[in-house]
């Protein structure tokens, strides 16, 4: 029998995910600039989709890099 536990989402459902909030977006990307998967961030599917769109929009507007060259 599988045991499921409720996870607390790191982003509150009332909080808006915005492409201009770079500090929040940086928490959900790796050092190489890749978007972290839902299973490691603990977000809901809806929040993950909004986060992904916000990160991609921030990349296009040059607020976030596509790749980190370190």
From Swiss-Prot:
One Gene Ontology MF term: structural constituent of ribosome
InterPro entries named among the record's database cross-references: Ribosomal_bS18, Ribosomal_bS18_CS, Ribosomal_bS18_sf
Top-level lineage group: Eukaryota
GO cellular component, one term: chloroplast
Gene3D superfamilies hit by this protein: Ribosomal protein S18
Pfam families on file: Ribosomal_S18
Keyword Ribosomal protein found: yes
Compartments (UniProt record): Plastid, Chloroplast
Any one biological process term the GO annotation gives: translation
Keywords linked to the UniProt accession: Chloroplast, Plastid, Ribonucleoprotein, Ribosomal protein, RNA-binding, rRNA-binding
PROSITE patterns: RIBOSOMAL_S18
Membership in a protein family: Belongs to the bacterial ribosomal protein bS18 family.
Xref: HAMAP family: Ribosomal_bS18 (MF_00270)
Subunit structure: Part of the 30S ribosomal subunit.
Official protein name in the record: Small ribosomal subunit protein bS18c
């Amino acid at each position: 029998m599988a045991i499921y536990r409720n996870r607390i989402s790191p982003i509150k459902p009332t909080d808006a995910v915005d492409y201009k909030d770079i500090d929040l977006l940086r928490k959900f990307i790796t050092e190489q600039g890749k978007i972290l998967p839902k299973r490691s961030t603990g977000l809901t599917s809806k929040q993950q989709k909004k986060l992904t769109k916000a990160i991609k929009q921030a990349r296009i507007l040059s607020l976030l890099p596509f790749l980190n060259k370190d």
